[in-house]
Amino acid sequence: MTGKTWLIIPAYNVDKYIDTLLFQTVCYIPPERTIVVDDGSSDLSGEIARKHGVQVIVHSNNKGKGRSLRDGLELVMQNGGDWAITIDGDCQHDPAKIPAFLSAGESDKYDIIIGNRHRSGTKMPWDRKLSNMLSSAVISVVTGQKIDDVQCGYRMIRISELKDFEFKAVSYDFETELLLKMVRKGARIGQVDIPTRYNGEASSIRRMRDTIRFIKLVSLYLIRRI
């Protein structure tokens, strides 16, 4: 059973999107179990989120998506949550797929469920697609579990699997670190097909820097340091 499921939304300068997103997510996860992490935004992201009655964590400066997710997960653990769904704050992920994640969690077959954008017919920018395919292939090989879209931030995580974990990553590599730590512990991975709506804005992922961080994480996993 999915029990108490929470929603975590990392938000950085998304005041154009956060209002619409929260109007949609409330259909599936109540405001009191929704956490928006305002990661040092210079716009009105946090103020708009508060109007929806959700819990808002504010960073005084931009600390990175990984730190936002870590802080959100810690709050879910403190409140005795069973699961956490993570969804980006820029409306690229469709909240209407939340029931599909909940259903996968209800099956009790998985400990982490990851969105898969590749079978939805969505046209992903070629550079993101290439990077994603390569990193997904590497993670699938080293973990022994097939993962089609390892870079997807739309996920559902069983909170009990995170007990005693210590994380170091604070940027986008946090999602890879979390996945590798969970697999090391024996986590079962599920996938849900999702569409993605690209809004035309440049990705905040820095390819070279994040590729180096990815290689480092995989290397640490292989020598059993993760």
Give the location of each predicted region.
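Short, well-formed alpha-helical segments that are part of the catalytic scaffolds
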Residues: N13-C27
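Catalytic donor-sugar/metal-binding loop of nucleotide-sugar-dependent glycosyltransferases
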Residues: K146, K168-V170, L180-R197
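Donor nucleotide-sugar binding loop of glycosyltransferases
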Residues: V14-Y17, S41, D94
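Acidic helix N-cap motif at the loop->helix transition within catalytic regions
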Residues: Y17-T20, D43-K51
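Acceptor/aglycone-binding surface of glycosyltransferases and processive sugar-polymer synthases
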Residues: H59-Q78, P95-Y172, Y198-S219, I223
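A conserved acidic beta->alpha catalytic loop
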Residues: D38-G46, C91
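Cell-envelope/extracellular polymer assembly enzymes that use nucleotide-activated donors
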Residues: K4-W6, E177
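Short beta-strand-to-loop acidic/aromatic patch adjacent to the donor-nucleotide binding site
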Residues: G81-D90
